[in-house]
Amino acid sequence: MAAIQGIEGVISQLQATAMAARGQDTHSQSTVSFAGQLHAALDRISDRQAAARVQAEKFTLGEPGIALNDVMADMQKASVSMQMGIQVRNKLVAAYQEVMSMQV
């Protein structure tokens, strides 16, 4: 769900840029920087991994109330969010390389 919010932020940024290029008023939409959205997404990925790691440690130590299925689900969520982050990075690098290879 957090990944979708990050993507929605990027989409709203692109829409605001497109509206500005057409000369339309963009004050009705909130302005969110791309770097800010990217940083927030990376923070969420890091937080999710840290929470999964802590829960795994608690399970290993035998704390009551920590079930194996919860630990495994949190570890999978952290893994999926990390893979999503890697894919976003790969797409950004590919887009950057494409822009840099354009002739002026």
Swiss-Prot record:
Record's protein name: Flagellar hook-basal body complex protein FliE
GO BP terms: bacterial-type flagellum assembly; bacterial-type flagellum-dependent cell motility
* Residue stretches spanning the membrane: none
Cellular location of this protein?
Bacterial flagellum basal body
Is Transferase given among the entry's keywords? no
Specify the species: Salmonella typhimurium (strain LT2 / SGSC1412 / ATCC 700720)
Q: Which GO terms describe its cellular component?
A: bacterial-type flagellum basal body
Q: Which branch of life, at top level?
A: Bacteria
Fetch the Pfam families from UniProt.
FliE
Q: Which family would the database say this protein is a member of?
A: Belongs to the FliE family.
Q: Which GO terms describe its molecular function?
A: cytoskeletal motor activity; structural molecule activity
Fetch the NCBIfam families from UniProt: fliE
Q: What is its main location?
A: other
Q: Which PANTHER family match?
A: FLAGELLAR HOOK-BASAL BODY COMPLEX PROTEIN FLIE, PTHR34653
Which stretch is the leader sequence? none
Per UniProt, the keywords (alphabetical) are:
Bacterial flagellum
